[in-house]
């Protein structure tokens, strides 16, 4: 998370996870990259599942999408089918078991729920009538926008997308931007804690990253 804040999109964190797998677990770069790619794909699948579940449970809150129930059902079936295909493909191409893939998917969804809970807490502070199910629709869209390599740490993109979506629920853009910035500052604090753990972990350092570059 620390590296994601200072690099475009999610590239920084992914590169450092590949680096950590290469150094600590002695994996070759191809295997390490495939593991990180698998986790990223499962994360996106988890985000899509959260979005679909939230959309179904939020009732008429998001009529602006203008999607019929039959269209939503078809989307859900396609999403589940795609999930099965992705998991099967990953299982064939890697040594990851189905049980581990399921665990990774669940952990990815729980991680996304962290942002949802944080935004809900800040919304309650401002006395905003936003439900968890509504945030299950909004936050996945915000997440997908921020992982695009457009700005550093998704700064500006996160605020714009969140303000636009919350405006559709009648929330003032100024309050939406404040909540988004509070979420960003929360991520910075968590990232700094992660960085402290990272630099105190044996056999990890930026000098080793230079060694990898020389070998590649």
What do these predicted ranges mean?
Residues 16-20, 30-36, 46, 152:
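Hydrophobic alpha-helical membrane segments of integral membrane proteins
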Residues 13-14, 26-41, 171-182:
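Membrane-interface alpha-helices at helix entry/exit sites of multi-pass transporters
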Residues 37, 161-164:
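Short amphipathic alpha-helical face segments that pack within enzyme cores
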Residues 18-24, 166-168:
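Helix-loop junctions at the membrane interface of multi-pass solute transporters
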Residues 19, 120-124, 163-164:
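Transmembrane alpha-helix boundary and packing residues in multipass membrane permease domains
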């Amino acid at each position: 998370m620390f590296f994601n804040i200072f690099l475009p999109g999610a590239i920084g964190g992914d590169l450092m996870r590949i680096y950590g797998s290469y150094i600590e677990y002695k994996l070759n770069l191809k295997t390490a990259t495939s593991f990180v790619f698998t986790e990223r794909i499962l994360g996106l699948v988890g985000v899509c599942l959260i979005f679909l579940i939230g959309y179904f449970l939020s009732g008429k809150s998001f009529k602006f999408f203008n999607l019929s129930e039959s269209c939503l059902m078809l989307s859900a079936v396609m999403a589940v089918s795609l999930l099965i295909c992705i998991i099967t493909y990953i299982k064939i191409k890697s040594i990851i078991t189905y049980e581990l893939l399921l665990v990774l998917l669940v952990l990815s969804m729980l991680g996304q729920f962290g942002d949802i809970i944080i935004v809900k807490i800040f919304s309650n502070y401002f006395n905003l009538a936003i439900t968890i199910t509504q945030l299950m629709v909004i936050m996945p869209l915000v997440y997908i926008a921020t992982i695009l390599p457009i700005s550093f740490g998704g700064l500006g993109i996160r605020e714009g997308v969140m303000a636009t979506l919350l405006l559709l629920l009648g929330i003032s853009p100024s309050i939406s931007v404040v909540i988004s910035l509070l979420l960003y500052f929360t991520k910075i604090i968590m990232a700094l804690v992660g960085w402290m753990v990272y630099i105190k972990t044996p056999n990890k350092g930026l000098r080793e990253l230079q060694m990898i570059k020389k070998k590649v």
